[in-house]
Amino acid sequence: MVCREQLSKNQVKWVFAGITCVSVVVIAAIVLAITLRRPGCELEACSPDADMLDYLLSLGQISRRDALEVTWYHAANSKKAMTAALNSNITVLEADVNVEGLGTANETGVPIMAHPPTIYSDNTLEQWLDAVLGSSQKGIKLDFKNIKAVGPSLDLLRQLTEEGKVRRPIWINADILKGPNMLISTEVNATQFLALVQEKYPKATLSPGWTTFYMSTSPNRTYTQAMVEKMHELVGGVPQRVTFPVRSSMVRAAWPHFSWLLSQSERYSLTLWQAASDPMSVEDLLYVRDNTAVHQVYYDIFEPLLSQFKQLALNATRKPMYYTGGSLIPLLQLPGDDGLNVEWLVPDVQGSGKTATMTLPDTEGMILLNTGLEGTVAENPVPIVHTPSGNILTLESCLQQLATHPGHWGIHLQIAEPAALRPSLALLARLSSLGLLHWPVWVGAKISHGSFSVPGHVAGRELLTAVAEVFPHVTVAPGWPEEVLGSGYREQLLTDMLELCQGLWQPVSFQMQAMLLGHSTAGAIGRLLASSPRATVTVEHNPAGGDYASVRTALLAARAVDRTRVYYRLPQGYHKDLLAHVGRN
């Protein structure tokens, strides 16, 4: 009996001991979770390679994924500046990293917080990170001015990250390419910089830029296509998010190149920055804002311009200014949205001659203008628009009337006769130079080239040459002549079209007939889309070719290839039927 009582007491002790151990483990786990997961911050958003917007949104420091809500503190280098930055309501700290005593006998190799030519500081990078990581939740952007500072700094970041102390996005910046107006090379070595990041601290956001110079008393050049393409060549293959710092005073003139750059990868964004002495136009900032998704561009701009820009940018009644060579995003299609939501509309015309007026459907979308020519090339030709009613309106009058209509529009010029191509492009160029063309513009035609050479159609080379020479800021929309499509879109037809369009920097939307997709080479749409990040496909159908039921399967198959990059140029009734079918399923 005594033995049993003793055994029972021992069991009770072990039970209590077990409960105590489990409780300690649970409490430790909770404490660890709270430590790693600061209030409001989602774990994925708190990693060094996280999206800055996701991080700030998790903390409640911004209200939506809009990069305009992010605020910046410049040159938080000295302890005094760092303390002021930490006590501010700024969301991201920007600081410069150099090497102590760089280029002197006193060079130590220690990373310090200083902007060249300063090579000494009361703040080392280690001290700076200790203060910022320990007392704030602010995002971090480190600007490296010399390659010698990069390796030791990344080693320190890696150590702190492994210790669990870096729970926020880290941006690693360096100017790695020679940019506008630079007479000498002062950039950080691109190859070494990128290699060090991949080797020592790959879980970060890259911020590679161009060295620039601006002088108000002399002519200033802007970023060139070659500069932008070289940058993409350098970083296109890296796995990180990439945000390109761009001098805001130079961005508008180079927008065709940056529009191209942003379209090359969903990992890309821009950070517009302003030097204190730079003249800056709020209209230029609004132009960039209008032509990008709100998460694609950060604005590191000084006051009072920043507040003025924000007020105008968020004004829903302001009339936006769209780049004619841009995509339909965000004007007619939200990022990631279904291309089926973009509708093609055909205007009608009442009257004739100078008194003719144009009417549009109530909905918004792409305005299809079948364009021909009045008169001969030798007689001062006038581009005209053919309408379903048979009435004719000049293209210039049509575009000017459209400019007065409220709403969101894109323009799709379908060149019906070869002689109308260059006069139509010349008109677009003139209206654009006058500031009267504020929508995305597509210029398309059924073209003759290679295995689909057919007399009477616009020559494929001529379409591309005319666009390049007369008005390059458009989306090119080539299609195949019906005469060669008896067996559908065969392999050689696809190959010749892709070879023709290879290397274009403009967006391309290949025009395909729905009735023929079922008879075509397997994967035809996918192959066209794979040719470029900017490539799209527009599936069209004429009611004379059959009712909706006859093309429904082909339309749904096209949509299954890519919901976001396939558009549908259909009669309004067919478009509604397709929307209804997709909605039911």
Curated annotation (Swiss-Prot):
Domain of life the protein comes from: Eukaryota
Look up keyword Transmembrane and say if it applies: yes
Subcellular location as annotated: Membrane
- Keywords assigned by UniProt? Membrane, Transmembrane, Transmembrane helix
Q: Name one Pfam family in it.
A: Menorin
Q: Which GO terms describe its cellular component?
A: extracellular exosome; extracellular space; membrane
Bilayer topology term: Single-pass membrane protein
Annotated TM spans: 14-34
Record keyword Membrane present:
yes
What family classification does the UniProt entry report for this protein?
Answer: Belongs to the menorin family.
Q: What name does the UniProt record give this protein?
A: Protein FAM151A
Origin species, per record, is Homo sapiens
The gene for this chain is FAM151A
